């Protein structure tokens, strides 16, 4: 039995300089697991609650000492002595202890830190790499990365309304080569922007954040960078967008301030369809407001056979909401953010539900990250097929890519890179 004998919660800083929660879990054998939780900038209204102190004079109210105290007191008391290898039972214990629908009492940040740290300790105790502990002998597929090379929206202080413009390397035989492709396109884009006298400063997720005149101009420039790096757009590298449409939906209209447009759901569907026709876009995330289910239905009916339509704010990694979306034919993919739901068990359940319905699952970081690379192990362990973890800069993003390189090396000849087949539900 891998009995838990000590739990330590602490307040650390994330990649934006805001407090977040870290947890150490010590087992009877002396084995330890450590985990840190991320935090989002654009968040869905139905996400599990991230507990903040609200004390204006300390970290502008963003401290997490209350969440840390919950770890060090009642959570510690509740799980001390439990078997760390019984993840589902441990997470159930956390859920019952919290007793709310949205984890608002203990805080999803406190609960997730403990859930992850326990899993890491149990994997170490078992002598298994974390991805293998999660997935067993069937874990052998590396994820296709969606690399956010231009940041807009809530992730950058520029004129772009769409939050993320991403490249997706698909023709490469290995993850290592896909990562190299992404890095080379990133540096080619930096040179193009520099030559134009445009900003090469980066946003929260490591992508560039220049002022483009339109989304169209931004996408065209990315195509130039792909070509400059020696790759073929539409063959070697595809494009993906995260609209984060909930952020610019006001008074029943999608208000693209950067382009001076106010569009209805039908008009915004037309807008996105035009972009998908003009550019090799394989995936669009949060193309409609999280509550605009009629708009989502329009978008899915229009593009759902040829473009991956990812629900992030729409589904918030929640099986109850995902089930409703599946039944209504809304979207065809779910973004998986571990801190949206708050425990590993619930996260894995969402991935499995998506797969059973032939929805793809994209494992994702948050804009406020740490050096914790657990999501890389989840992506491989659960054979998710896709990961979204930022650009090719900032060590908080690169840590996940580097972990995937290590995993691919560890897997050796049995490692596989799915490329275009990761989008298995598209025609």
UniProtKB/Swiss-Prot annotation:
Its cofactor is Mg(2+). Its EC number is 4.2.1.11. It comes from the Bacteria. Catalyzes the reversible conversion of 2-phosphoglycerate (2-PG) into phosphoenolpyruvate (PEP). It is essential for the degradation of carbohydrates via glycolysis. One of its GO terms (molecular function) is magnesium ion binding. Its main location: cytoplasm. It catalyses: (2R)-2-phosphoglycerate = phosphoenolpyruvate + H2O. Pathway: Carbohydrate degradation; glycolysis; pyruvate from D-glyceraldehyde 3-phosphate: step 4/5. This is Enolase. The active site is at residues 205, 337. Keywords: Cytoplasm, Glycolysis, Lyase, Magnesium, Metal-binding, Secreted. Binds a second Mg(2+) ion via substrate during catalysis. Belongs to the enolase family. HAMAP family: Enolase. One of its GO terms (biological process) is glycolytic process. Pfam families: Enolase_C (PF00113), Enolase_N (PF03952). One of its GO terms (cellular component) is phosphopyruvate hydratase complex. Transmembrane segments: none annotated. It is an enzyme of class 4 (lyase). Mg(2+) binds at residues 242, 285, 312. (2R)-2-phosphoglycerate binds at residues 163, 337, 366-367, 388. InterPro entries: Enolase, Enolase-like_C_sf, Enolase-like_N, Enolase_C, Enolase_CS, Enolase_N. It is found in: Cytoplasm; Secreted; Cell surface. PROSITE patterns: ENOLASE.
């Amino acid at each position: 039995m891998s009995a838990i004998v000590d739990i330590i919660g602490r307040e650390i800083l994330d990649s934006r300089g805001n407090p977040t929660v870290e947890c150490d879990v010590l087992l009877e054998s002396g084995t330890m697991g450590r985990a840190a939780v991320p935090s989002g900038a654009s968040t869905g209204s139905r996400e599990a609650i991230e507990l903040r102190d609200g004390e204006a004079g300390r970290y502008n109210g963003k401290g997490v000492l209350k969440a840390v105290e919950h770890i060090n007191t009642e959570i510690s008391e509740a799980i001390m002595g439990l078997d760390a290898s019984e993840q589902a039972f441990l997470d159930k214990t956390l859920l019952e202890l919290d007793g709310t629908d949205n984890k608002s009492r203990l805080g999803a940040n406190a609960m997730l830190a403990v859930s992850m740290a326990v899993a890491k300790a149990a994997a170490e105790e078992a002598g298994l790499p974390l991805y293998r502990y999660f997935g067993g002998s069937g874990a052998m597929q590396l994820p296709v990365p969606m690399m956010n090379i231009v940041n807009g929206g809530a992730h950058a202080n520029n004129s772009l309304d769409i939050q993320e413009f991403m490249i997706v390397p698909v023709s490469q035989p290995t993850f290592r080569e896909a990562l190299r492709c992404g890095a080379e396109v990133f540096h080619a884009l930096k040179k193009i922007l520099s030559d134009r006298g445009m900003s090469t400063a980066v946003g929260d997720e490591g992508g560039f954040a220049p002022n483009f005149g339109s989304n169209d101009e931004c996408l065209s420039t990315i195509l130039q960078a792909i070509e400059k790096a020696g790759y073929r757009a539409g063959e070697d590298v595809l494009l993906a967008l995260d609209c984060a449409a909930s952020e610019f939906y006001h008074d029943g209209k999608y208000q693209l301030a950067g382009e001076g447009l106010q569009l209805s759901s039908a008009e915004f569907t037309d807008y996105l369809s035009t972009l998908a026709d003009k550019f090799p876009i394989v995936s669009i995330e949060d193309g409609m407001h999280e509550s605009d289910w009629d708009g989502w239905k329009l978008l899915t009916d229009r593009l759902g056979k040829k473009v991956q339509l990812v629900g992030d704010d729409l589904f918030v990694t929640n099986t109850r909401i995902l089930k409703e979306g599946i039944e209504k034919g809304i979207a065809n993919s779910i973004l998986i953010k571990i801190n949206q739901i708050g425990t590993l068990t619930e996260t894995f359940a969402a991935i499995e539900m998506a797969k059973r319905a032939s929805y793809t699952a994209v494992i994702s970081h948050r804009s406020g990250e740490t050096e914790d690379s657990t999501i890389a192990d989840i992506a491989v362990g659960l054979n998710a097929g896709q990961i979204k973890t930022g650009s090719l800069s900032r060590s908080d993003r690169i840590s996940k890519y580097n972990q995937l390189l290590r995993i691919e090396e560890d897997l050796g000849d049995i490692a596989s890179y799915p490329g275009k087949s990761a989008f298995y539900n598209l025609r």
